[in-house]
Curated annotation (Swiss-Prot):
Residues 391-400 have a biased composition (Polar residues). Zn(2+) 2 binds at residues 859, 862, 881, 885. ANK repeats lie at residues 282-311, 479-508, 511-540, 547-579, 623-657, 660-689, 701-732. MORN repeats lie at residues 16-38, 39-59, 61-83. PROSITE patterns: ANK_REP_REGION, ANK_REPEAT, ZF_MYND_1, ZF_MYND_2. A zinc finger (MYND-type) spans 845-885. This is Ankyrin repeat and MYND domain-containing protein 1. It comes from Mus musculus. Gene3D superfamilies: Ankyrin repeat-containing domain (1.25.40.20), Histone H3 K4-specific methyltransferase SET7/9 N-terminal domain (2.20.110.10). Zn(2+) 1 binds at residues 845, 848, 868, 872. Keywords: ANK repeat, Metal-binding, Repeat, Zinc, Zinc-finger. SMART domains: ANK, MORN. Residues 391-411 are annotated as: Disordered. The keyword Metal-binding applies.
Length: 906
């Protein structure tokens, strides 16, 4: 067995002199070939491993090796002094130290900076080890003898190294690997001792991670510093000689891929002059350059020559994600309530000389809103035409901008009178017959414009874009610009489909977000369908700093029919329809009225008796928003929101979870969407679900001042009737809190509590209010009176099920404590009899329904009802109590006689 330092030669003329270990070249040594070539450096089991110098007749290579191949940073020097510098893989440059000026960078997309919250990972220095002791339940492929394969002593026969040195076909035990590494790094710091934090991963492509790990392993070698390896890793080429041929060809190939020079690239790859996976110092590859410029033939060529379709840039972006970012610009994203985005300002229209197409920029926004059919059956959606139309102005028309704004509507206004509004502010505006006029005033002039419909322009652009070649004109009009944008967009879509068909992973890149998020945010139904068919995952989320939203959260908030279609697509794949966002601390519509103290005084009132309502046996789950919460929160398109809610409920979304104190039902009430309310109630939403954060129940939300602008009083009354018809109990207890005082009441008390928060309308004399304030006062009063009526009917319904005689005696005994029966008898017997017949009843004003903050007084004749004021007493007497009181008074002698007989019975 060869061990130690020595020399060994072969009859072929090859020779090695250096360190041996277990019959292998292992350690420092020099290997020479008959042609004069030599390698001086580190060997590992008879293979070049680590830093070394390779001498040939035509060049000198200094760099890192692994398993007998170049693998990492290196410098190849030629006789003329030029050098190829970068990261090497075998005989090819894999990454340059120079940057292509036109390379892709997220710096050019500042709108996504908020999504760049993920920090770079560090190198994992520990080798993967299989843990022992996996149980049969944890390991689906468990069998009894499997653990023997995990034992170093049982992997190889004893003394295997004595009669075989073929380690390339034998398993490497952990103990042998540790022994070999100790021999290589005998006089140095062990490679994986954490004397410092591991390096940050500069590029997460698996091959480049392995290269960086190999470089880190040999970082303490002298060559690492003397050969300027850190400068290569940083992409700093200033300390090296002029670029060599391989470096020049590699850089030129990236630029040729942008230009679309297929023949030149094919010749380079055919002659093996460069690697199809080469990238600049920032990881911008040839494939990315070709894909960004939609050169499909070059993309296919590179993939045929082995380019990695999922290779990432240093920013972590794959070619597929670059294409998606280009296909879905920020302006194509729909504003939605899931992300709390705001509507953008309407763009301004342009005035062209002599003929003013009012489409101009409004035409661009139209393409964002609707899909335009293009050749091949695809659709043009969410187009980024602003950039392409930015240069459409000629020098003569560059100063002819309207001052008025044109809203992006679906049809073009034909009202010519609106043109004069902006003309007064633009003294240089052109007229139909004059371009060079320069009067001080244009009030006497009129610009007679020709309004061309969008349909005509779109059809013209569609026909023009279908031509095989477009003639070049020095000035391109709106139609040609639109046609050019259609062609570019179609090519980008074809590039995306090609990359996905050739194996691009839509889940790999998470910077700035997954591709599925981009398609959903843009409302592209076909894009979402393509990604889902390509295996895009749906259980993805935004970072916690952005509320951890899922694609379903955004899909259910999209306006229009595309939101319904995308939601349906996602629900066919998604696993957790009740995924929660990280916004559990968000306060939904915390208006000023919530901050004002109510003038209603709380005196620890007990609320309705327990026999008057049914108690909830479970505590509702509370957390972040679910997709159902988002859909019920929508105020934009009530019909589409209803359809989305129906889809979610059909996939078993839970309608009885809380967010910000609200249930989906209360959110639908607060947002004013009665269609969603009806859908939720019909699908089993609980109208009596107790809400948190002082919201009470769904009936309480109807009369909350914060949401009173969502519907008229008639609609609120109809909503109350609908809730009650689906089982809403107006007698459910509601706890009111103000400071250190609490009280328990009903939805009526909650309504009056909120009513008295607006002190001006609640307490000012009616004649002192403005007309609008009077309308508000009357509307609130009418709603509360109707709710009080429903409360009285509910109480009377409960009391009708009780013993009328016992109920009357209980009320009379409690409300008139000084009352005594006229007949003689034992007072103790009568007291015991009254206690036996005592029935709890609800003390509230039978006219307005209030039980909190009022002083109740019974009817002095019958003690059958309670009222809180003279106004309520008079109104109750007129409306309903006059007849009831007379009926009760007629029954009193009979009731008292019955009570006496009961008291006398043994």
């Amino acid at each position: 067995m060869k061990l130690g330092y020595g020399e060994f030669s072969w009859p072929t003329g090859e020779a090695y002199h250096g360190q041996f270990y277990r019959d292998h070249f292992h350690g420092l040594g020099t290997y020479t070939w008959p042609d004069g070539s030599s390698f001086t450096g580190t060997f590992y089991l008879s293979q070049r491993e680590g830093y070394g110098t390779m001498h040939t007749k035509t060049m000198l290579f200094q760099g890192l090796y692994k398993e007998d191949q170049r693998f990492g940073p290196g410098i190849e020097t030629y006789p003329d002094g030029s050098q190829d510098v970068g990261l090497w893989f075998r005989e090819y440059l894999l990454k340059l130290c120079t940057r292509v000026p036109s390379g892709f960078s997220l710096v050019n997309y500042p709108e996504f900076l908020a999504f760049l919250t993920k920090s770079r990972r560090r190198l994992d220095l520990s080798d993967e080890k299989v843990e022992l002791g996996l149980s049969e339940e944890q390991d689906p492929f468990f069998y009894d003898y499997k653990q023997y394969l995990l034992n170093d002593e049982l992997k190889l026969p004893p003394e295997m190294h004595v009669y075989s040195t073929d380690n390339s076909h034998l398993p490497m035990t952990d103990s042998l690997r540790q022994e070999l590494d100790d021999h290589i790094f005998m006089n140095e710091i062990p490679p994986f001792i954490e004397d410092e934090e591991p390096w940050l991963i500069t590029n997460e492509t698996p091959l480049l991670v392995k290269i960086q790990k190999q470089t880190y392993k040999f970082r303490n070698k002298d060559a690492h510093t003397s050969w300027n390896i850190p400068a290569i890793l940083e992409g700093n080429r200033s300390r090296f000689g002029p670029s060599g041929p391989k470096e020049q060809i590699s850089k030129k190939m990236i630029m040729k891929a942008e230009e679309g020079d297929y023949n030149w690239i094919f010749g380079i790859l055919r002659d093996n002059l460069a690697c199809a996976d080469v990238a600049d110092s920032k990881g911008y590859t040839v494939l990315a350059a070709a894909a960004m410029h939609s050169h499909l033939d070059i993309v296919n060529l590179l993939l045929d020559f082995g380019a990695d379709v999922n290779k990432r840039s240093d920013e972590g972006i794959t070619p597929l994600s670059m294409c998606f970012l280009q296909y879905y610009p920020c302006k194509s994203f729909h504003p939605n309530i899931a992300e709390r985005t705001l509507l953008q300002e309407s763009p301004k229209s342009l005035v062209t000389p002599k003929i003013s197409f009012l489409l101009a920029d409004a035409n661009i926004d139209y393409l964002y809103d609707v899909g335009m059919p293009i050749a091949g059956g695809d659709e043009l959606k969410t187009s980024s035409l602003d950039d392409s139309l930015a240069s459409m102005q000629t020098p003569e028309s560059s100063n002819m901008l309207h001052k008025e704004e044109v809203s992006p509507v679906k049809t073009v206004s034909t009202d010519v009178e609106k043109e004069s509004e902006g003309a007064a502010e633009n003294v240089d505006a052109s007229t139909l017959y004059s371009v060079d006029t320069n009067f001080e005033s244009t009030k006497c002039l009129r610009n007679y414009t020709i309004n061309v419909s969008r349909d005509i322009m779109e059809k013209s652009a569609q026909a023009y874009s279908s031509l095989p070649q477009h003639p070049c004109f020095p000035y391109k009009g709106t139609v040609r610009k639109m046609a050019q944008s259609m062609v570019e967009r179609r090519n980008r879509w074809m590039t995306i489909t090609l990359l996905l068909r050739r194996g691009a992973d839509p889940n790999l890149c998470q910077v700035p977000m997954q591709a599925l998020f981009l398609a959903v945010k843009a409302g592209d139904v076909e894009g979402v369908r393509l990604l889902l068919m390509s295996g895009a995952q749906t259980d993805i989320q935004f970072p916690p700093q952005l509320q951890s939203l899922t694609p379903l959260h955004i899909a259910v908030s999209l306006p229009g029919e595309e939101g319904v279609k995308i939601t349906e697509l996602l629900l066919h794949v998604i696993t957790n329809v009740d995924a929660k966002a990280a916004d559990e601390d968000y306060v939904y519509k915390g208006g000023k009225a919530d901050l004002l103290p109510s003038s209603l005084k709380l005196n620890n009132e007990p609320g309705p008796p327990k026999s008057f309502y049914s108690t909830h046996t479970f505590i509702p789950e509370e957390g972040g928003r679910t997709a159902l919460h988002v859909a019920c929160e929508r105020e934009d398109n009530k019909k589409c929101a209803r359809d989305i809610v129906r889809l979610l409920l059909s996939h078993r979304a839970n309608p009885n979870v809380l967010w910000s104190g609200h249930s989906p039902l209360s959110l639908a009430i607060a947002s004013g969407n009665d269609l969603v309310v009806k859908e939720l109630l019909s699908q089993g939403a609980d109208p009596n679900l107790p809400l948190t954060k002082g919201l009470g129940t769904a009936l309480c939300v109807v009369c909350d001042l914060v949401y009173e602008q969502q519907r008229s009083v008639e609609n609120k009354i109809a909503l109350i009737d609908r809730l009650i018809s689906y089982g809403a109990d107006v007698l459910n207890p509601v706890t009111l809190v103000q400071g250190d005082r609490t009280a328990v009441g009903t939805a009526v008390d909650y309504g009056y509590f909120k009513f008295f928060q607006d002190r001006k309308i609640a307490h000012c004399p009616f004649h002192a209010l403005m007309p609008a304030e009077r309308e508000v006062f009357m509307a609130r009063k009418r709603l509360l009176e109707y709710l009080g009526l429903q409360l009285r009917l509910a109480v009377l319904s409960k009391e009708s099920r009780l013993d009328t005689k016992a109920l009357y005696l209980s009320k009379r005994a409690e409300l008139a404590p000084c009352h005594r029966l006229k007949k003689k008898g034992s007072s103790s017997v009568r007291t015991q009899s009254s206690e036996k017949q005592s029935i709890p009843f609800y003390k509230f004003c039978y006219q307005c329904g209030r039980s909190i903050g009022v002083r109740l007084s019974p009817c002095p004749r019958c003690y059958g009802i309670l009222t809180c004021s003279k106004y309520c007493k008079t109104k109750a007497w007129i409306e309903f109590h006059k007849k009831d009181c007379n009926d009760i008074m007629a029954m009193i002698p009979h009731l008292e006689g019955s009570a006496w007989r009961v008291a006398e019975s043994p």
